[in-house]
Amino acid sequence: MATVDRWLLPDGIEEVLPPEAACIEVARRQVLDLFQSWGYEFVVTPHIEYLESLLTGAGSDLDLRTFKVIDPQSGRQMGFRADITPQVARIDAHTLKREGPSRLCYAGSVLHAQPRALSSSRSPIQLGAELYGDASPSSDVEVISLMLAMLQLADVPDVHMDLGHVGIYRGLARAAGLSGEVEQQLFDALQRKAIDEVVALTADLPQELASMLRALVDLCGGREVLDAARDRLAGAPAPVLAALNDLLAIAERLAARFPQLPLYFDLGELRGYHYHTGVVFAVFVPGVGQSIAQGGRYDDIGADFGRARPATGFSTDLKTLVTLGQAEIVLPSGGIWVPDSTDAALWQQVCQLRSEGQRVVQALPGQQASAAREADCDRQLIQHGEHWQVMPLAS
């Protein structure tokens, strides 16, 4: 690499400079305090793990997004975490082994071999919360409400939420007895809302099942979609009706709690189909081409760690949250400039001021008083006899 290129960073990898880094850290603390006030306990997961542990219970998408290296000590393949959610699921299932509901939260950098979308970061700061041990819609309502509280804290404007339930499609596909290949083809067609392909792929199915699978293309829109789904899926198998009832219950409770929140339903939206097992949700804002927070239910993941537990949760990118949020983040400003001196009384005064939460910057040898302004100091310590006093910095 030429000397002139040594400062270049890989595509999608960025450094965060002051004061933006300070804003991100303040926001991180505020959000984690919010999570704690809801009863969520903070956990820290490893940046790198053996690959089989890191990808256990996850879909192929995570495998493709994971940077892989060889451990020089063991010779085994390792991966840098691309998603913290499976790691937290392992903590709940294998390490904590609690019997009742468990609420956990996290915040940390992740690394993506491939970005989520064109021009997006490959080094986001993932932040999220997970609720384990309860399979009821109440848990889904709780984590969605917490996610919305987080967005309110950050003052993200014009939030819209998408809701769906992968159990509706999964139940219909199982009832139809689709092969793995055909199910994947139908899944892809539904994501693109390619009705002609959906019709062709369901042509050999019983008419009632074919009609219900085709209906998923059109069942998208406002609250009226759920009423239409009740009519068009009335003859569906019991698991499908149970999934629809869960989605209805969640939607009603969210509408009551957040009456101003626009809700959009898409029963053909199968985000995370190979990973999620129930309700799926995502938050969008105008002008941003991808979701800014997302989550859902994933009840099967704990089984891969020896203990299946109901689970639901969400995640977001803290950098995106700070960028889009309009909440005023007040950063500490000003400080006290201290001259370069070995005076013992000065050192005691500096220690006392720092213990009180004051920002104190001591001059280094050769630094002039003019450097105080560059260090964002607005006061200085001046010696009066044997004592040092804090005085305004001369302009």
Curated annotation (Swiss-Prot):
Signal peptide: none annotated. Pathway: Amino-acid biosynthesis; L-histidine biosynthesis; L-histidine from 5-phospho-alpha-D-ribose 1-diphosphate: step 1/9. Keywords: Amino-acid biosynthesis, Cytoplasm, Histidine biosynthesis. Its main location: cytoplasm. Pfam families: tRNA-synt_His (PF13393). It is found in: Cytoplasm. Gene3D superfamilies: Bira Bifunctional Protein, Domain 2. GO terms for cellular component: cytoplasm. GO terms for biological process: L-histidine biosynthetic process. This function is generally fulfilled by the C-terminal part of HisG, which is missing in some bacteria such as this one. Heteromultimer composed of HisG and HisZ subunits. This is ATP phosphoribosyltransferase regulatory subunit. It comes from Pseudomonas savastanoi pv. phaseolicola (strain 1448A / Race 6). The lineage of its organism: Bacteria, Pseudomonadati, Pseudomonadota, Gammaproteobacteria, Pseudomonadales.
